[in-house]
UniProtKB/Swiss-Prot annotation:
One of its GO terms (biological process) is butyrate metabolic process. It comes from the Bacteria. Disulfide bonds: none annotated. It catalyses: butanoate + ATP = butanoyl phosphate + ADP. This is Butyrate kinase. Its main location: cytoplasm. It is an enzyme of class 2 (transferase). The lineage of its organism: Bacteria, Bacillati, Bacillota, Clostridia, Eubacteriales. CDD domains: ASKHA_NBD_BK. It comes from Clostridium perfringens (strain 13 / Type A).
Length: 356
């Protein structure tokens, strides 16, 4: 049976929705919200009714009857750290999404919106693999400073989706393989997946790992300390150097990887150096994760928007091919990944997890 699903993925200035029948996309729409509309609301949670009305209006215009839906799936938000999987939305989750226990983020509305619409039609609401998925082993959490433990914040939804895709295409299960998955987008996350769990991964938002189009990755801590207390920068300005204006933006004044690739291909000296450093850092992180997996790696999987570039993937493969074969799944399909998570539960392949 092909289940009919509504998928909701809220961003800061847009809400992406999809309607799926099984894994087949019936509708995909990006509902854009102007700055003026968003600024009317003091908090992200205050946008709930506004976004819900916009979603229902578009569904009606497109001839989608919400009463025909089997479930509603939202993108998971900044909840407490949880293990990966599909979670049924409950009151405890809604309360934590309202307050944003790990910070404000538009994705916090995903679970709440899906719950609101599902309640109206008497159906179930789910979230799947939010960014706060944390399956790290205790040994990976120590940083050297007890007050600063390493944290798991990464592209969990896409990393898990492509890992499961690899397993399916190789006639095995995600729980039976060891993979290193590299997501390359605005941020870069490199995860060690051992038998269905991400036992180590860099904090791709503001922690460690390779630099990326907009993020600094791991930086020398002593120099960062000097910068913080130099009196030249506010806390916000330093944070912006790490997230938003780090990486490619800092070195080349662009957040578009294609610009760096072009400069490197043309032999531009500075552009080539930045590009080579980007490849070097990703390959180095892959090497680290190979050690985490005791050298037992079935494949290295590259994904995210930058993985569409053969120039990038070939350069990485040249450095890491001695570890394991490489597989490339360019881009990311968050709506499909959310749909697949719900289908696994509705089909009885997995049980819905309970958020506490």
């Amino acid at each position: 049976m092909a289940y009919k699903l509504l998928i909701i993925n809220p961003g800061s200035t847009s809400t992406k929705i999809g309607v799926y029948e099984g894994e087949k996309e019936v509708l995909e729409e990006t509902l854009r919200h102007s700055a003026e509309e968003i600024l009317k609301y003091a908090t992200i949670f205050d946008q709930l009714d506004f976004r819900k009305e916009v979603i229902l209006k578009v569904l009606k215009e497109k001839g989608i009857d919400i009463n025909e839906l089997d479930a509603v799936v939202g993108r998971g938000g900044m909840l407490k750290p949880i293990e990966g999987g599909t979670y049924e939305v409950n009151e405890a989750m809604v309360e934590d999404l309202k307050i944003g226990v790990q910070g404000p983020h538009a994705s916090n509305l995903g679970g709440i919106l899906s719950n609101e619409i599902a309640k109206e039609i008497g159906k179930r609401a789910f979230i799947v693999d939010p960014v706060v998925v944390d399956e790290m082993e205790d040994v990976a959490r120590l940083s050297g400073v007890p007050e600063l433990p390493r944290k798991s914040k990464f592209h969990a939804l896409n990393q898990k989706a492509v890992a499961k895709r690899y397993a399916k295409e190789h006639n095995t299960s995600y729980e039976d393989v060891n993979l290193i998955v590299v997501h390359m987008g605005g941020g870069v996350s490199v995860g060690a997946h051992r038998k269905g769990r991400v036992i180590d991964v860099n904090n791709a938002l503001d922690g460690d790992g390779p630099f990326s189009p907009e993020r600094a990755g791991g930086v020398p801590s002593g120099e960062l300390l000097e910068m913080c207390f130099s009196g030249k920068y506010s806390k916000e300005e330093v944070y912006k150097k790490l997230v938003g204006k780090g990486g490619f933006v800092a070195y080349a004044n662009t957040n578009d990887a294609r610009d760096l690739i072009k400069l490197s291909q043309e032999g531009d000296e500075k552009g080539s150096l930045i590009f080579n450093a980007f490849i070097y850092q990703i390959a180095k992180e892959i090497g680290s994760m190979a050690v985490v997996l005791d050298g037992e790696v079935d494949a290295i999987v590259l994904t995210g928007g930058i993985a569409y570039s053969d120039y990038v993937t070939n350069a990485i493969n040249k450095k890491v091919k001695w570890i394991a074969p490489m597989v490339v799944y360019g881009g990311e399909d968050e709506l499909l990944a959310l749909a697949q998570g719900a289908i696994r539960v509705l089909d009885g392949v997995e049980e819905a997890k309970i958020y506490k």
